[in-house]
From Swiss-Prot:
It is found in: Cell membrane. This is Killer toxin KHS. Kills sensitive strains of yeast. The lineage of its organism: Eukaryota, Fungi, Dikarya, Ascomycota, Saccharomycotina. The gene is KHS1. Unstable above 30 degrees Celsius.
């Protein structure tokens, strides 16, 4: 019995020691924060799953069966004790993570450790571990350097650390919440040191394989000799990871491109498209430069990284400057102060395109704010959204909303600020990727006076391999203006611009209050609000129509549309297609010559003069434009099925305008049921999305928030 008691006491002591090692969090630097969730050790999980561990655990459990410990304590102690008796590998793990508590300088391992006839060297400046060679076994190659080092060994002109943070998955991508979270959870990380003949390299580590902060892992390895010069010149590569889930990481990694020039690349652990909903960042009065991880460091003359300045609201009726994007210039070699030489300047399209070419997947920022301004009628909201798709994965690469007070805008020669328009032109140019190519783009606006509405003119530009279309926007004096850029070769890529005027103009809607007998008893403001909702719902339906078209889904899938109605619409499309000379003709079905004024009256409650003739005229113009497009040799071919669907969209779009405005004289009785069914389906987003299996892939704008 005394012998068993001694063994039992030793097992308990050693078990407590191991449990402290494997379940406790390792102290970190004063200016770093460890992960919220405790780190798990893969080695321990591996040991516990072995059959020999179970056998030893049962043996210990039988020896301790008569003790006074609880059943849970018995199982825990026996499992640990069984693991100790089963294998000597735990000794290796215990030695590797056996760091003393205290400051960082007191937690370093000894220079060499001999375990199982294998010597593991550790240098003095490695404070938190080192990647082990394969000689110690495959289960011991996951210990990584954790992101801090002695500053004396860093070759940098400045010792400024990297500033980073983590945005939890549950947080909504709203500006205010992210700003408050970032201000309270900023984390400073020092760079990887550069020493002698050892170059530092980066690698991803799974969340359960890290012994320190679970969202940063820097692996130190001597085998990356090809990066040695880069490390010596730049002071070591840096990695910055932001995540929502512990196993889904986003990193900014520096790589070597065969020359001294370095590129900023992005990748994700799960090989999915990166979405900037993960990386919404804001600081007080300053737009955070995402990806600009070398902002304060010297020795990076070869870097030209794109910086993003996110507009943030300072007060309720603030007028925001139109510097939507900024690019940091390379430092002037004559200037000794690297920090001051990296000044900010207004960005251009060429800067952004050149930078995006050096990135695996071009991306920008997404933010959704200004919702509290909805009750201010004097404020105009601008929203720019760019969607990019590769395969079946959708990614929002840019959404920005800017809001301008009407009085301040009116002071700029009655038009929108030229700087904003310039940035809008540049923003649309970021689609100059292998999928899209826009040689030039111009946005024209009209005066914002009360007597004349503003809208965007139609534009159509072609390049060598692609043709870009911009749907001619139909301006509604209260509601919104949409401009859609569409590439016929890549129907899953398009650009949507929304210009919303929250206050009705006097030239149209206010006059209808005097002539509409059914609204004479309604107050003016209430009537305007009703019309605004109606117009906004209509345009929202139109946008969904375009997105519906991009998925090439047939109209017969819409609930409530019978086969006869679908066949009738198909015959209508075939009738238009018959105007083309051959089945292989290039078809472009966009109302490129329609003016905004030509369809503006269809959205009012006043009856149209010669409505049937007006529709026939519009259809004739539409077909003539298609015939002219076929004669252009630079245009690419298009599928006839897609053409029929697009024409159907245009036809139903006009019918919907008449249906909403109660202009039933334009609609025949045969089409009324179809238009009503399609209109109702679009107005009910959940029902409309559930109709098509492919709809969850799309990104929908619902109350100013993008829903995937």
């Amino acid at each position: 019995m005394p012998r068993f008691a001694i063994i039992f006491a030793l097992l308990i002591a050693y078990s407590l020691f191991l449990s402290t090692l494997f379940t406790g969090s390792i102290p970190d630097r004063a200016n770093t924060v460890t992960s919220n969730a405790p780190c798990q050790v893969v080695i321990w999980d591996w040991i516990r799953t072995r059959r020999i561990c179970n056998c030893c655990s049962r043996l210990c459990y039988s020896l301790l069966g008569r003790s006074n410990l609880s059943r849970t304590a018995k199982r825990g102690v026996c499992t640990i004790a069984g693991a100790v008796l089963a294998t000597a590998a735990v000794i290796v793990a215990a030695v590797l993570v056996g760091k003393s508590s205290g400051s960082a300088t007191k937690r370093g391992l000894t220079k060499t450790i001999s375990v199982l006839n294998h010597t593991i060297p550790f240098t003095d400046h490695i404070l938190n571990g080192q990647t082990l060679s394969n000689g110690t076994g495959s289960n011991f190659v996951t210990i990584g350097f954790s992101g801090y080092a002695v500053h004396a060994t860093i070759k940098r002109a400045s010792t400024t650390d990297i500033i980073s943070w983590v945005i939890p998955e549950s947080m909504e991508p709203t500006l205010a919440r992210v700003a408050s979270y970032v201000s309270s959870s900023s984390i400073n990380l020092a760079a990887v040191p550069d020493t002698g003949g050892n170059a530092s390299a980066l690698s991803f580590q799974n969340a359960v394989q890290e012994f320190a902060t679970s969202w940063v892992s820097m692996t130190y390895d001597q085998s990356y000799g090809d990066l040695r010069n880069v490390a010596n010149d730049e002071g070591g590569e840096e990695i910055l990871i932001l995540m929502r889930k512990r196993s889904y990481r986003i990193s900014f990694q520096v790589i070597e491109t065969g020359s001294t020039a370095l590129l900023l690349r992005t990748r994700r652990v799960v090989s999915q498209l990166i979405t900037m909903t993960y990386l919404v960042t804001v600081q007080a009065r300053v737009g955070i430069q995402i990806g600009d991880i070398f902002q304060h460091y010297g020795g990076i003359d070869n870097y030209v990284m794109t910086s993003i300045s996110v507009l943030r609201t300072l007060e309720d009726k603030a007028f925001h400057e139109n510097k939507l994007l900024i690019v940091r210039e390379p430092p002037n070699k004559s200037n000794q102060d690297a920090n001051q030489s990296y000044r900010l300047r207004p960005f251009s399209a060429n800067d952004l395109i050149q930078n995006l070419k050096s990135v695996d997947i071009g991306f920008l920022a997404f933010c959704s704010f200004f919702d509290k301004y909805a009750h201010y009628p004097e404020i105009i909201m601008m929203k720019i959204t760019i969607f990019i798709s590769k395969g079946n994965l959708w990614s929002i690469i840019y959404v920005i909303q800017a809001r301008y007070v009407r009085k301040r805008v009116m002071k700029v020669r009655g038009q929108m600020p030229g700087g904003l328009l310039t940035n809008m032109e540049s923003l649309l140019n970021i689609v100059s990727t292998p999928n899209l190519n826009i040689s030039e783009f111009h946005i024209q606006t009209h005066s914002m006076s009360q007597s004349k509405p503003m809208y965007f003119q139609k534009q159509c530009y072609s390049s060598q391999n692609n043709i870009i279309y911009i749907y001619n926007s139909i301006h509604i004096t209260c509601g919104a203006v949409y401009v859609i850029v569409h590439d016929v070769r890549t129907p899953s890529v398009f650009v949507l611009i929304e210009l919303r005027n929250c206050k009705p103009l006097k030239n149209s809607w206010c006059e209808t209050t005097k002539t509409s007998p059914r609204d004479t008893k309604i107050k003016k403001n209430e009537y305007n609000e009703t019309v605004c909702r109606r117009a906004g719902a209509l345009l929202d339906g139109r946008v969904r129509t375009i997105r519906f078209l991009m998925m090439r889904t047939h109209w017969s899938r819409v609930k409530g549309v019978s086969c006869n109605t679908a066949n009738r619409l198909s015959r209508f499309c075939n009738h238009v297609v018959s105007y083309y000379p051959s089945q292989n003709a290039t078809i472009h079905l966009l109302p490129t010559s329609l003016r905004a004024e030509s369809l503006e009256q269809q959205y009012t409650t006043r009856p149209l003069s010669s409505s049937n003739n007006r529709f026939c005229c519009l259809k004739s113009i539409f077909i003539n434009n298609c015939k002219k497009a076929c004669e252009s040799p630079s245009l690419v071919s298009c599928n006839l099925q897609q053409t029929a669907e697009l024409l159907m969209v245009y036809y139903l779009y006009i019918c919907e305008a008449c249906y909403v405005s109660r202009n039933h004289d334009l609609l025949s009785k045969q089409c009324m049921s179809t238009v009503r069914a399609v209109y109702v389906a679009r107005m009910r987003l959940p029902k409309f999305r559930s109709t098509f299996p492919c709809m969850p892939r799309l990104c929908w704008l619902v109350n100013g928030v993008v829903v995937v």
